[in-house]
């Protein structure tokens, strides 16, 4: 894969509920012609199979082939990395993309990233983005939040990390679960600076029913 940090991004899926968010975000990033390094935790594969019915092999190359077939995307735009692939570009500040999204992000991943852990490639990639002053978005899916969860998120926010709880809005009058997923993915794309038209934007011409 050729390295172009301006059109390259790291996406991580962890074991939190919300696999459809991560899959839809991947689809949109690829459609926007981004090269995506995808990091998948073992728990994320279980959640993806449970919530979406998509069973990915543990082998990174096989998982990549399965996703390319499932999404119908170009094979050269997606690289699935092993959880201990320390030779991956995302593991080094000299080669890693400047943007990273963890979606969905578990509370455990929030804690590990907040405290600089690098026990797997997801944590290391996040640590690299932080030390290189890149853009890190965490789409946290947990409820309720404990005091410890909130303290970890506050710590990360002070570091410049964008904390985006997976809490879709309803003012666009969603008609399906896909509409709710698109709302969150649209907000993520907005923060990444990627054009999107997944949901109508709020504006003065928007009518609110019931008035």
From Swiss-Prot:
Enzyme class of the recorded protein, top EC level: transferase
Pfam families reported in the protein's UniProt record:
Flavoprotein
Q: Which residues bind FMN?
A: 15-17, 41, 106-109, 141
Write down the chemical reaction(s) this protein catalyses.
dimethylallyl phosphate + FMNH2 = prenylated FMNH2 + phosphate
Where along the chain is dimethylallyl phosphate bound? 171, 187
Q: Which terms are listed as keywords in the entry?
A: Flavoprotein, FMN, Prenyltransferase, Transferase
The answer, when asked if Flavoprotein is one of the entry's keywords, is yes
Q: Name one GO molecular function term.
A: flavin prenyltransferase activity
What EC identifiers does the entry list? 2.5.1.129
NCBIfam families reported for this sequence = PRK06029.1 (NF004685), ubiX_pad (TIGR00421)
Q: Which PANTHER family match?
A: FLAVIN PRENYLTRANSFERASE, FLAVIN PRENYLTRANSFERASE PAD1, MITOCHONDRIAL
Main function: Flavin prenyltransferase that catalyzes the synthesis of the prenylated FMN cofactor (prenyl-FMN) for 4-hydroxy-3-polyprenylbenzoic acid decarboxylase UbiD. The prenyltransferase is metal-independent and links a dimethylallyl moiety from dimethylallyl monophosphate (DMAP) to the flavin N5 and C6 atoms of FMN.
**What family does this chain come from, according to its entry?**
Belongs to the UbiX/PAD1 family.
Q: What protein name does the entry list?
A: Flavin prenyltransferase UbiX
